[in-house]
Every structure is written in structure tokens, then in C-alpha cells.
């Protein structure tokens, strides 16, 4: 796009379509809105069109959907070979190709990307994260999988044992949570990056924590970061909980 003097734009939905049809079945997200904006910006995207998926979008006819997209002034569309659009996914790559000729825009259809025998998809990545295979999930994502949050006040048991931890509550998280256990991680604190070890789970060693929690011991770090935002990048699962 930039070689031709055009802007590079990405069209995406800000929520999962199940939010309209099966709100109890909405799968966990793999990225926060802020992470999405940051990653796309780093990839050179000039414009992010992040549209809420609602019933008006779900019911729109394929041709009407393309007509609304024309307001963006695009000259070229790039889609995957399994792309569908419009009500019940009635618009396909074949109908899009016919519309491209009629409306005068260039259409580029890309093959799906695979990691070995597995097609890379959000479903496949969620499965890997749920299994604790953050190494393979990172290979599919092209980055380390990350969780972020505000450091909460815990029971300070880690401090009593000589290794204070930064605690993030996960009960309200809308992101996929890796399988419980101990992970090697990288921690981003106040613009600095540190190594660390993190535990996900209900702390069975102590047995009195009701909600899932992410507890992280940050190597070579000392400081008060209560109520501060941090992000945890998962490198590898070391073991299950004890």
C-alpha cells in the first residue's frame, strides 16, 4: 500500500459475533483493544477500522456491506481464501471477485497461513493456551502471549517467604487464561523489562484463594508497584501447580 502512496487500513470487528447470538458462548479474546492498536501500528497500519458487531451488521446483505465499505475510499482489498461477509456469510470470495470487477477495485486473495499441519487461527491458539503450550501459541501469534492488569494487594505470603510477588486478579479477565501452573515469563514494568516466574491458579499450596490469580516473582526488581499496570509475557510452562 505504501509503495503506491496509499494508506494501509485494517477492518476488524471489536467484539466476537457470538456476542449477538450466543453471549454465553463468547470465546476469550487473545488481545486487548490497546494491544491490537499498538501491534497494528508497529506493523505499519495507518488506519484501524474497529467496528462493533451488532444485529444491524449481522443482517446486512453482502452488496450493502460492500457499498458501506466504499465510504472508506479503498482501491484494493486483501482477504483470506475463506473470507465471507454479509448475512449468514452469503458473500464469498467468488461473489467478492465479481463485485471487484463491477465496482472497480483490486482484489487480492491470500492462502491461509499454517504452522506445520495446523492452520493458524484464533481457535487453534486458544486451544494451545488452554493446554499451557505457550511456546507453540507464541509461534502462531508471532509474539509472546501476554496478560496485563493492575497489581493488586495480595496476602503478601510471597514476601514472607522471601520472594515478593506482583498479583493480578484474573476473575474478570476477558482474555484466554493459560492452563494453571508455573511459567517462565518476561515482565514489563514502568517501561522496563525483567525476567520472572509466574504462577496461575488458586494457590493449592495455601488452599484459601477462591478466584484465579496470576502471581509473578520479578527477578532483580524491588519497588512498590501496587496499583500500577504491568504486563506478563509467557515464555514457557515449567510445571503444573504443586
What are these regions (language model features)?
Residues 52, 81, 111, 200-202:
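Short secondary-structure boundary segments
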Residues 154-242:
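Phosphate/ribose-recognition catalytic cores of enzymes acting on nucleotide-derived substrates
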Residues 59-164, 240-241:
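Classical nucleotidyltransferase
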Residues 2-72:
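Core alpha/beta nucleotide-donor-binding catalytic domains of modification enzymes
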Residues 14, 54, 113-115, 238:
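Short, solvent-exposed coil/turn elements at secondary-structure transition points
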Residues 4-6, 45, 105, 143, ...:
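Short glycine/serine/threonine/alanine-rich loop segments
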Amino acid at each position: 500500500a505504501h509503495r503506491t502512496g496509499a494508506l494501509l487500513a485494517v477492518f476488524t470487528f471489536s467484539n466476537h459475533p457470538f456476542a449477538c447470538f450466543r453471549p454465553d458462548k463468547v470465546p476469550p479474546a487473545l488481545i486487548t483493544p490497546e494491544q491490537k492498536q499498538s501491534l497494528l501500528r508497529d506493523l505499519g497500519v495507518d488506519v484501524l477500522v474497529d467496528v462493533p458487531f451488532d444485529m444491524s451488521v449481522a443482517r446486512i446483505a453482502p452488496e450493502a456491506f460492500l457499498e458501506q465499505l466504499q465510504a472508506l475510499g479503498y482501491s484494493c482489498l486483501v482477504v483470506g481464501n475463506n473470507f465471507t461477509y454479509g448475512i449468514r456469510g452469503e458473500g464469498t470470495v467468488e461473489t467478492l471477485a465479481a463485485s471487484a470487477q463491477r465496482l472497480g477495485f483490486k482484489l487480492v486473495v491470500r492462502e491461509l497461513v499454517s504452522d506445520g499441519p495446523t492452520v493458524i487461527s484464533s481457535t487453534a491458539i486458544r486451544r494451545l493456551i488452554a493446554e499451557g503450550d505457550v511456546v507453540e501459541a507464541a509461534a502462531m501469534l508471532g509474539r509472546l502471549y501476554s496478560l496485563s492488569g493492575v497489581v493488586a494487594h495480595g496476602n503478601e505470603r510471597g514476601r514472607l517467604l522471601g520472594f515478593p510477588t506482583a498479583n493480578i486478579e484474573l476473575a474478570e479477565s476477558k482474555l484466554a487464561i493459560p492452563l494453571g501452573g508455573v511459567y517462565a515469563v518476561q515482565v514489563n514494568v514502568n517501561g522496563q523489562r525483567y525476567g520472572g516466574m509466574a504462577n496461575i491458579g488458586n494457590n493449592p499450596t495455601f488452599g484459601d484463594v477462591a478466584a484465579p490469580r496470576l502471581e509473578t516473582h520479578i527477578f532483580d526488581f524491588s519497588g512498590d508497584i501496587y496499583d500500577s499496570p504491568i504486563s506478563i509475557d509467557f515464555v514457557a510452562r515449567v510445571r503444573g501447580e504443586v
